[in-house]
Amino acid sequence: MITLSNKKNKLNEHKNSLCVTYPRTVNIIFGHYPYPEVIHSFLLEIKNNIDPEMENYTHVKGGMTNWHYFLKNDLFTNFMTYIINKHQTSHPDIFEYFLEKRTIREAWGNEVKSGDHLNPHIHNHIHGILYLTEGCDLILPDLNISITPHPGDYYM
């Protein structure tokens, strides 16, 4: 049995990641953003800013904001700050000096209604998703896993 001697140490925070190899290797960093009022604000931002020209434009066949809608948005900035602070000790290769080493090129929101769907696709770079509502499972067939998300859950 291992006991942590300094329980107030910042390194003792609960962090989650899963490394999956089937047939490729992917490290999935995940957690829960514990601010329901912010999740609700994200929902309203998306609902009120759907761009009709972006509908069905990506693999998500539903409503979408502009590709860059959230880049300068305080809700998104605060969410990213939370993610960086939460995971920089467990994943320094990604999150240490994140804002100095990396550029977030796009940050948008999707609205998926009944009858909308998602086409299978793959991401080759770091990407993430913050779930704002209950929905269907996130199925990753190339990793042979299925994820059941809840509002506030994020995956990178």
Residue ranges: model-predicted function:
Residues 97-156:
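Catalytic core of non-heme Fe(II) oxygenases with the double-stranded beta-helix
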Residues 2-99:
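Non-heme Fe(II)/2-oxoglutarate
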